[in-house]
């Protein structure tokens, strides 16, 4: 039986931290207290104008490859989860492949499930590996959400940051992914979306992120609890056997509400939203890499990753490191 396991993790945050006070100094009608009380966010990172999602992904990927002890040409599958691709086409995954110097014909494609994207990408990669068609995958979440924010809308622009996280997933004799579940319900698309599009060389409609925060909160807490319980049930284990919970880092209130529903202490929740903001598809692999490198997540530990994002999409996976 072929299984899949994480062999290495990596991440990258562009530039210096941008504090809430820095945003106020830039003219945004908000305050440090207002942002912290509602979101738990104290700072975030924003990419410079010349940096793209594939640039962020490249550095995160190089760090994951180094941690796994493999060369770029050892990768035979590249999946990039992003809602802020470098261009309409080719895929950001193909551009990343070129930047990493991978010339072996590895398959490369993007996944667009917004903040659930990394869970989707990891689950897809695991299926490829377990089928025997591929042996080693590079799965990346990379975003430059600062490009799609309306900086006059203080209800959204203060929430997001830019960054990338990556894992190397490889074939193994013992399971590293114990269970997974993916879901979507497109009827909820109006509560979190970028409604605009490009047509005939013009931007048609609204090109900025729009969100109904209260509706998103209620939906997110419900489905994050449900999908975590779903993967636990699939694996035949209880939440008490899980060492860590790594949710999508949307805001601290969603993390706290999800932990309460699952009966998990916040001490077991990997939290980065305070210093990263919401980095969409990058948030889970960023948090995972941080926890691996600081020694919290160690070999043998079990953890749940889970995300919810525009679409609406949601998903979770139970892993053993």
Curated annotation (Swiss-Prot):
GO terms for cellular component: cytoplasm. Pfam families: ACP_syn_III, ACP_syn_III_C. Its EC number is 2.3.1.180. GO terms for molecular function: 3-oxoacyl-[acyl-carrier-protein] synthase activity; beta-ketoacyl-acyl-carrier-protein synthase III activity. One of its GO terms (biological process) is fatty acid biosynthetic process. The active site is at residues 115, 248, 278. Pathway: Lipid metabolism; fatty acid biosynthesis. Keywords: Acyltransferase, Cytoplasm, Fatty acid biosynthesis, Fatty acid metabolism, Lipid biosynthesis, Lipid metabolism, Multifunctional enzyme, Transferase. It is an enzyme of class 2 (transferase). It is found in: Cytoplasm. Residues 249-253 are annotated as: ACP-binding. Catalyzes the condensation reaction of fatty acid synthesis by the addition to an acyl acceptor of two carbons from malonyl-ACP. Catalyzes the first condensation reaction which initiates fatty acid synthesis and may therefore play a role in governing the total rate of fatty acid production. Possesses both acetoacetyl-ACP synthase and acetyl transacylase activities. Its substrate specificity determines the biosynthesis of branched-chain and/or straight-chain of fatty acids. NCBIfam families: fabH, PRK09352.1. PANTHER family: 3-OXOACYL-[ACYL-CARRIER-PROTEIN] SYNTHASE, BETA-KETOACYL-[ACYL-CARRIER-PROTEIN] SYNTHASE III, CHLOROPLASTIC. The last Arg residue of the ACP-binding site is essential for the weak association between ACP/AcpP and FabH. Belongs to the thiolase-like superfamily. FabH family. Homodimer. This is Beta-ketoacyl-[acyl-carrier-protein] synthase III. The gene is fabH.
């Amino acid at each position: 039986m072929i299984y899949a396991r994480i062999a290495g993790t990596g991440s990258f945050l562009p530039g210096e931290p941008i504090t809430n006070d820095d945003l106020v100094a830039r003219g945004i009608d908000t305050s440090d207290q207002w942002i912290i009380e509602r979101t738990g966010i104290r700072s975030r990172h924003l990419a410079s104008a010349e940096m793209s999602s594939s640039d962020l992904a490249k550095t995160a990927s190089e760090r994951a490859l180094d941690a796994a002890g493999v060369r770029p040409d050892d990768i035979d599958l590249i999946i990039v989860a992003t809602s802020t691709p470098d261009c309409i086409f080719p895929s950001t995954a193909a551009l990343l492949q070129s930047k990493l110097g991978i010339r072996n014909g590895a398959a490369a494609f993007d996944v667009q499930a917004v903040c659930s994207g990394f869970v989707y990408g990891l689950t897809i990669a695991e299926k490829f590996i377990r089928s025997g068609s591929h042996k080693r995958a590079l799965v990346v979440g990379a975003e430059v959400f600062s490009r799609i924010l309306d900086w006059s809308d203080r209800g959204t622009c203060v929430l997001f940051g830019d960054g990338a996280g990556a894992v190397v997933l490889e074939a193994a004799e013992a399971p590293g992914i114990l269970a997974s579940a993916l879901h979507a319900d497109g009827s909820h698309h109006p509560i979190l979306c970028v409604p605009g599009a490009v047509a005939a060389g013009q931007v048609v409609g609204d090109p900025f992120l729009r969100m109904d925060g209260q509706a998103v909160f209620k939906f997110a807490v419900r489905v994050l609890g449900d999908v975590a319980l779903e993967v636990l049930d699939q694996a035949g284990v209880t939440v008490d056997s899980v060492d860590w919970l790594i949710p999508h880092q949307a805001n601290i209130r969603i993390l706290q509400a999800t932990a309460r529903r699952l009966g998990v202490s916040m001490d077991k929740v990997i939290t980065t939203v305070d210093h990263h903001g919401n980095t969409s598809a990058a948030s889970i692999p960023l948090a995972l890499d941080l926890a691996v490198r600081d020694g919290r997540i160690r070999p043998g530990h079990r953890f749940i990753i889970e995300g919810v994002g525009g679409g609406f999409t949601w998903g979770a996976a139970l892993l053993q490191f």
